[in-house]
From Swiss-Prot:
Basic and acidic residues bias locations: 449-463
Gene that encodes the chain: KRE33
Keywords: Acyltransferase, ATP-binding, Nucleotide-binding, Nucleus, Phosphoprotein, rRNA processing, Transferase, tRNA processing
Transmembrane segments: none
UniProt region (Disordered), positions on chain: 433-463
Highest taxon listed in the record's lineage: Eukaryota
Name of this protein: RNA cytidine acetyltransferase
Residues given in the record as acetyl-CoA binding sites: 638-640, 645-651, 739
Residue span(s) of domain N-acetyltransferase: 566-706
PANTHER family per record: N-ACETYLTRANSFERASE 10, RNA CYTIDINE ACETYLTRANSFERASE
Pfam families cross-referenced by the UniProt entry: GNAT_acetyltr_2 (PF13718), NAT10_TcmA_helicase (PF05127), TmcA_N (PF08351), tRNA_bind_2 (PF13725)
Organism: Saccharomyces cerevisiae (strain ATCC 204508 / S288c) (Baker's yeast)
Location of this chain's protein in the cell: Nucleus, Nucleolus
Length: 1056
């Protein structure tokens, strides 16, 4: 194969990077891109033999035509030699490269394991599986002078990536919104052109026009004696500490001045031996946090600390920390096996990571790794070190704090960006505690072991805090272009800037601010104005309470169902039409419009599709097939500038958003057609005409781009039924959504792993839409929430739980029905719940005749009746009384706990509780009185009625006499009627057979003529009978009846 001279710009870029300790990026396009990897690695190593040779190769599932298993590769070579397809010692450069170099292969899904490691070269294949998180996580592991290589498949134009379907897009699609636009890919490709250390080449190393480093020139050789000012300062610091031990030996290990000062701060805290003290170290990636912690642990050992515990999300992340512990030991003169022993984990998941170090030089000392959840083993701890605290859930980090020295390190803007959450929440709480203790007493500097008895009570509730930050990178040189490019691309290092106009003139009233729709095509077009506005939006996200990650940027840009809105102050004409800084950013996701068939299939299988969080969740929780067919918008994020928080801007943005979707800004005239504000996509015809070597990839013309911001009247809204939100429940956030008329319908029973908060879903029905379904959902939610308060929601404060219950009642105000079927308690229901003995006990307790524990079994039911609105308005409790009843009755907390929670004395809490029971006892007594009263006749006392102001009629004798006569006449007629009916019954009971006429047809025939005449004349006819009947006398009838009565008496006597 003929050799070809490579472009001189390629070795120039690599050598410049090695010389200046800056990284380089190569994007190789082509199916044979892997064959150029050995060449690039060789150029890097030839520039400086001291360079890190190790290689990180990250991929999705399969490597590019080879296996990472050494034995499998050897077996394959043996088979090929047997077949005769290759010579015995034949090996191409690529095979030699993967066989001889130290390559760490890692799946993208397992890339967390590489945190804390450093490599000289990073190879990323399977571009379609790349995400912003993966880019930041892998690129940050490369040291200064190293190379990042991105491998792309063959294509005729890089613009094909604009329309490329990424793996993550599958999660963005929903049933109603499936058209994904890869805006992030376009912005990524355009950003390569502005990266001065990036070359885009084909698989034959021809430099393509897009390359940002296409004009690179070799730097003049660097003189060996030449040192930058920072290094000179560090050298002076090390020399000044040579006589101070052990600080001098340990600081000599530091790489930057920043790191040296951090180590000295740690040593100061260690030497003070202070209880309840926290040292928080925050920095970006590659600043030497783990190294500083490792050196400080070595200092703690030299100061005699016996029980040192180290924790991190995984022991594999502590590789650098333990490495520098041992470097510190070496500097202090410790020897392995003589002064200390190293114990590795036998757990296969931990990959033989170090989990324990036993030191036995002066006395027994231990450095022990613990899982973050094992905070209960810290009883004897003297020093606890938390590395990568941002990746550990906040509640767990809080549990790790105790009466001992705590060192905490966290990344504030790295691959996950979770350190912002840590700095906003945990460090802010510690800072507040520190300020509070400072106001309470001036003795806040040190609590030493000598006088700890004297001051222990003072500091039992607060921790002192010392904050350290590192800003000088160690892996690579300060001002590394790749770091700048990555921070700009993923908006990692955005900071919020105060508005100078507001400082002089004050903030505008919320009613003067307007909401605008952000056009995402323009926002992610990589134009300078758009980039500036995007950074301001992301700065609001980062400074808010949300946990941020780079992946959120791709969600914002590519997800088809997502929309962006910003609240802007009034535009000042003096600013020359400049877009003002946003006060509030809202990101929404359109959800719903799911077919009933899809819902039915998912519910029957117990599964749900991706996206459409609220529809699927509510359908699953309430087993309702109808709800998912409604269309709604979930507010994914709403971030207000913290400088102007609690000024009503967030509520104003929600109000305008609600008005927008209710159609209050829509132009209803028929002749106005809405404009199409989307940009033209790259077509197949356009791509077919291009050639990779002549591919002109550049920014879109600003004139062809749609406006960045659109008025609400310019963009017609989707027809929605409701607005919804899903967030981690905190008291302040719940208060905000409650004040904006949102109603809770779901509260997750298990807390979120990262934040420790329970996910809450709240809904708000838009005006003019059917709302009865929300009333029913809220009623069902309240019933379930009351039942679960003694289980997973037991840890809620009573005030927080009470606030949730009150917000669920707000749904009744939205109902079309004036009356609600909240059935109040009745006597029958009361008898089913409580026995007379129970009511007597309650009555005795309310009269202070019994102890609180005697009625303990009744309190849960009493609380359930009250909060279930079964007592109506008859029992009215104040807010504090309601909180006490809820805490004791539903959360099953004891009196002391609720007294401490409400900041009340215990005796006052008991007195208020007794007052609650008295009210309920009176209500039950009144209920029983009413039920008995209903069974009694209604006696009306004229004197009392006259006192009540009722009109009393005077007595009229004539009227009474007439009424009496009417009553007598009516009674007489009733008596006569009854007597007649009785006579009729007697007649009917007589035997009339003896009066029957014989059935003699001859006699009837003879008398027929006389019968017809009698019938016409309505007269009487006499018929002749065969024999004359003897007439019965009254005496005969009397004797017969008397005999009949005597016979039964005789038979009874005979029986006796």
């Amino acid at each position: 194969m003929a050799k070809k001279a490579i472009d001189s710009r390629i070795p120039s870029l690599i050598r410049n990077g090695v010389q200046t300790k800056q990284r380089s990026i190569f994007v190789i396009v082509g199916d044979r891109a892997r064959n150029q990897l050995p060449n690039l690695h060789y150029l890097m190593m030839s520039a400086d033999l001291k360079m890190n040779k190790s290689v990180l190769w990250a991929y999705k599932k399969k490597l590019l035509g080879f296996t990472s298993h050494r034995k499998k590769r050897e077996n394959k070579i043996k088979k090929e030699i047997k077949r005769g397809t290759r010579e015995v010692n034949e090996m191409d450069p690529f095979e030699s490269f993967i066989s001889n170099q130290n390559i760490r292969y890692v799946y993208y899904k397992e890339s967390e394991k590489i945190l804390g490691n450093t490599y000289g070269m990073c190879i990323l294949q399977d571009f379609e599986a790349l995400t912003p998180n993966l880019l930041a996580r892998t690129i940050e592991t490369v040291e200064g002078g190293g190379i990042v290589v991105i491998l792309l498949k063959s294509m005729s134009s890089l613009k094909q990536l604009y329309t490329m379907t990424m793996d993550v897009h599958a999660r963005y699609r929903t049933e109603a919104h499936g058209d994904v636009v890869a805006r992030f890919n376009e912005r990524f490709i355009l950003s390569l052109g502005s990266n001065p250390n990036c070359l885009v080449v084909d698989d034959e190393l021809n430099v393509l026009p897009l390359s940002g480093a296409k004009n690179v020139k070799p730097l003049p050789p660097k003189e060996d004696d030449e040192l930058p000012p920072k290094q000179l300062e560090l050298q002076e610091l090390k020399e000044s500490l040579e006589d101070v031990q052990p600080a001098g030996s340990l600081v000599s290990l530091s790489k930057t001045v920043n790191q040296a000062h951090a180590i000295l701060s740690f040593i100061d805290a260690i030497s003070e031996k202070t209880l309840n003290f926290t040292v928080a170290l925050t920095a970006g990636r590659g600043r030497g946090k783990s190294a500083a912690l490792g050196i400080s642990i070595a200092a703690a050992v030299s100061h005699g600390y016996s029980n040192i515990f180290v924790t991190s999300p995984s022991p594999e992340n502590l590789k650098t920390l333990f490495e520098f512990i041992f470097k510190g030991f070496d500097a202090l003169g410790y020897q392995e096996h003589i002064d200390y022993d190293i114990i590795q984990s036998t757990n296969p998941d931990f990959n033989k990571a170090i989990v324990r170090v036993d030191i036995k030089r002066d006395h027994r000392q231990t450095i022990q790794y613990i899982v973050p959840q094992d905070h209960q083993v810290l009883g004897q701890a003297e020093l606890v070190v938390i590395d990568e605290a941002a990746a550990i859930p906040l509640p767990i980090v809080k549990n790790l704090l105790g009466p001992y020295l705590v060192f905490m390190a966290s990344t504030i803007n790295g691959y996950e960006g979770t350190g912002r959450s840590l700095s906003l929440k945990l460090i802010q709480q510690l800072r507040n505690q520190n300020n509070t203790s400072g106001r309470e007493s001036t003795q806040t500097a040190v609590v030493s072991r000598d006088n700890k008895e004297k001051d222990s009570h003072l500091h039992s509730q607060s921790r002192q805090l010392r904050e350290i930050s590192l800003d000088e990178p160690i892996r690579y040189a300060p001002g590394d272009p790749i770091e700048k490019w990555l921070n700009k691309l993923l908006c990692l290092d955005v900071t919020l800037i105060k508005n100078p106009r507001f400082a002089t003139r004050g903030t505008p009233h919320p009613s003067q601010c307007n909401l605008f729709v952000v056009n995402r095509d323009t926002l992610f077009s990589y134009h300078p104005v758009s980039e500036n506005f995007l950074e301001k939006m992301m700065a609001l996200y980062v400074s808010s309470h949300y946990k941020n990650s780079p992946n959120d940027l791709q969600l914002m840009s590519d997800a088809p169902a997502h929309k962006l809105f910003v609240l802007l102050p009034p535009i000042d004409p003096k600013d020359g039409g400049r877009i003002p800084d946003p006060l509030c950013v809202i990101q929404i996701a359109l959800e719903g419009e799911i077919s009933k068939e899809s819902v039915r299939n998912s519910l029957s299988r117990g599964q749900r599709a991706g996206g459409d969080l609220i529809p699927w969740l509510i359908s699953q929780q309430f087993q309702d097939e109808e709800f998912a067919s409604l269309s709604g918008a979930r507010i994914v994020r709403i971030a207000t500038n913290p400088e102007y928080a609690s000024m009503g801007y967030g509520s104003r943005a929600i109000e305008l958003l609600r008005d927008y979707f209710e159609g209050k800004f829509t132009d209803m005239s028929e002749d106005v057609r809405p404009k199409d504000y989307s940009i033209k996509r790259v077509s197949d015809k356009e791509l077919a005409k291009t050639n990779l070597l002549k591919d002109d990839v550049k920014l879109r013309d600003a004139k062809t781009l749609p406006p960045l911001l659109l008025k609400l009247s310019e963009q017609p809204p989707h027809y929605l039924h409701y607005l919804g939100v899903s967030y981690g429940l905190t008291q302040s956030l719940h208060k905000f959504w409650k004040n904006n008329s949102f109603v809770p319908v779901y509260l997750r029973q298990t807390a979120n792993d990262l934040t420790g908060e329970h996910t809450c879903v709240m809904l708000n029905v838009l005006e003019g839409r059917e709302s009865n379904w929300l009333v029913e959902f809220a009623k069902d939610f309240r019933k379930r929430f009351l039942s679960l308060l003694s289980y997973d929601f037991h840890k809620f404060t009573a005030v927080q739980a009470l606030s949730v219950i009150e917000s669920s009642k707000k749904a009744q105000d939205l109902s079309d029905d004036e009356k609600h079927d909240n059935k109040e308690l009745t006597r029958t229901h009361l008898d089913d719940i409580f026995s007379p003995f129970d009511l007597k006990r309650l009555d005795s307790y309310s009269n202070n005749l019994l102890d609180y524990h005697v009625i303990g079994d009744m309190i849960p039911m009493l609380a359930l009746l009250y909060f279930g609105d079964k007592m109506g308005d008859s029992v009215k409790l104040s807010s504090v009384q309601s909180a006490i009843l809820l805490a004791i009755g539903l959360q099953r907390k004891n009196i002391d706990t609720i007294a401490k929670e409400l900041n009340l004395p215990s005796n006052q809490t008991i007195a208020m509780f007794a007052k609650i029971m008295r009210k309920m006892s009176q209500y039950f007594r009144q209920l029983l009185s009413q039920s008995i009263e209903e069974t009694l006749p209604n006696i009306k006392d004229d004197a009392i009625a006259e006192m009540d102001g009722e009109e009393i009629k005077n007595y009229n004798a004539a009227e009474a006499l007439d009424q009496m006569e009417e009553d007598l006449e009516e009674a007489g007629s009733e008596a006569v009627q009854a007597m007649r009916e009785k006579q009729k019954e007697l007649i009917n009971s007589l035997n009339l057979d003896k009066y029957a006429i014989n059935d003699n047809s001859e006699e009837w025939a003879e008398s027929q003529k006389s019968l017809e005449i009698a019938a016409k004349a309505k007269g009487v006819v006499s018929l002749k009978t065969g024999k004359k009947r003897t007439t019965e006398k009254a005496e005969d009838i009397y004797r017969q009846e008397m005999k009949a009565m005597k016979k039964p008496r005789k038979s009874k006597k005979a029986a006796n």
